[in-house]
């Protein structure tokens, strides 16, 4: 894994300077094709003429070595690095290749030694500094950045702060990465830097900065998939849905080499849902569910999103079905998770009448009862929800169905020393219900006791004042 990390950072992120050999050199291209197509046992024989013709050309020898390294043939890659060194002992790219070979073998210490030699022989080669810094970053990103500062004096034309930002980004030090990038003139940033900055901003909730950088990049290349994706995500998170849908379309239909992921479908579904395009949202969430089939947690999250979309559409049966699937598969369901199912039932009941409505409210009550049993620390929450459901089952309060739950809630909350505003609001609701209940029962003394308690919490409560004859 270390090797993969080092090579990805060193090869994919670096872009300020390519090795000194020309990528389009005919000899390297020809050799690379042979290496890809020939078995390891006979490849050197197949390369004989090319090597003979270029035995004094260290750039070609290093190019051949890189071709072997790309095929994970570290033995022959190192051989050609050594051949290049033998031809020119001061040729820095040969030492960089040797370092890359050691990285592929997970020997960071040996790789560091080769990169240091490359720095020694060519103090102006940014590859050597950056790759050496990537070895150091595992131990100390700050030390790695300090190493890059040596390059600043050697190559004032290089945006060293951008290189430092890459180190911080690869070390998941996102704020420091952004701060380093902000020291660099935008015009000197390469595509990878624009992507890094925009991604760092997105991940660290600096959405406007992320969006601004993504849009800056899109001015250069409107078909860049990563930048269209980040613009789409940020606009969705910011609730700017028209813009979100615009960039979603650009990601899906007007980006080069876009690999659409489950996250993309999920975000598209959220944007459609926010725009009340429920059928489109459902379609996208189903595509996300398929794309995320290998990830149980992501797929389960998509089931909840499908439930939300069906609920918004008014399709309560599907909303309940997907939510129940979500609850079955969530690792550690919370009280809020369970309450979500009850909420769907209460929403469904509000659209019904008669016995059908009563049956649905009873299902909601059953869910909230289960909530209180499974999560005793949330018993006040459960009693509050059950009180409301039972109030709906007994709208004229004649049966007092909500009474035991409001009594339990009031008994608990009145003894709570550190009540917050939510607690006080619920306590007032409980006292008001109980005051009205006893008023209907013509037990004025008990009713007045509850109305007075309402005024203790809310001295300006008009209902309580009227009940007590104060108005």
Give the ranges of each region predicted by the language model.
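Alpha-solenoid helical repeat scaffolds
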Residues: 2-8, 12-440, 463-471
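Alpha-helical oligomerization segments
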Residues: 444-469
């Amino acid at each position: 894994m270390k090797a993969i990390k080092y090579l990805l950072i060193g090869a994919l992120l670096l872009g300020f300077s390519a090795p000194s050999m020309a990528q389009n050199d005919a000899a390297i291209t020809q050799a690379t094709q042979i290496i890809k197509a020939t078995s390891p046992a006979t490849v050197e024989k197949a390369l004989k003429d090319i090597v003979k013709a270029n035995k004094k050309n260290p750039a070609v020898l290093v190019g051949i070595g890189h071709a072997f390294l790309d095929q994970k043939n570290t033995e022959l890659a190192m051989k050609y690095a050594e051949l290049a060194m033998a031809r020119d002992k001061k040729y820095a790219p040969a030492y960089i290749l040797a370092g890359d070979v050691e990285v592929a073998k997970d020997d960071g210490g040996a790789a560091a030694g080769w990169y240091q030699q490359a720095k020694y022989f060519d103090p102006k080669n940014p590859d050597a500094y950056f790759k050496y810094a990537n070895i150091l970053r595992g131990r100390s990103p700050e030390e790695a950045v300090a190493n890059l500062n040596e390059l600043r004096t050697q190559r004032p034309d290089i945006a060293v702060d951008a290189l430092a930002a890459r180190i911080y980004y690869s070390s998941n030090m996102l704020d420091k990465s952004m701060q380093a990038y902000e020291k660099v003139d935008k015009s000197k940033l390469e595509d990878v830097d624009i992507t890094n900055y925009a991604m760092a901003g997105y991940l660290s909730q600096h959405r406007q900065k992320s969006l601004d950088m993504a849009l800056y990049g899109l001015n250069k290349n409107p078909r860049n998939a990563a930048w269209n994706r980040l613009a789409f995500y940020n606009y969705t998170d910011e609730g700017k849905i028209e813009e979100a849908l615009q960039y979603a379309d650009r990601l899906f239909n007007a980006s080069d080499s876009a690999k659409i992921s489950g996250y993309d479908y999920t975000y598209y579904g959220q944007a459609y849902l926010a725009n009340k395009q429920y059928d489109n949202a459902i379609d996208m969430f189903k595509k996300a569910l398929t794309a995320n089939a290998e990830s149980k947690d992501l797929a389960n999250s998509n089931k909840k999103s499908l439930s939300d979309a069906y609920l918004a559409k008014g399709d309560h049966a599907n909303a309940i079905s997907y939510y129940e699937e979500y609850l079955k598969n969530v690792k550690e369901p919370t009280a809020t998770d369970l309450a979500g199912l009850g909420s769907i039932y209460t929403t469904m009941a509000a659209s019904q009448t008669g016995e059908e409505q009563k049956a649905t409210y009873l299902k909601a009550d059953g869910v909230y009862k289960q909530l209180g049993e499974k999560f005793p620390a949330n018993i006040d929450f459960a009693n509050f929800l059950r009180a409301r459901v039972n109030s709906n089952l007994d709208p004229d309060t004649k049966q007092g169905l909500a009474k035991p739950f409001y009594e339990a809630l009031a008994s608990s909350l009145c003894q709570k020393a550190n009540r917050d505003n939510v607690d006080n609001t619920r306590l007032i609701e409980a006292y008001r219900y109980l005051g009205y209940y006893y008023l209907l029962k013509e037990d004025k003394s008990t009713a007045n006791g509850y109305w007075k308690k309402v005024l203790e919490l809310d001295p300006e409560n008009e209902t309580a004042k009227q009940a007590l004859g104060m108005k």
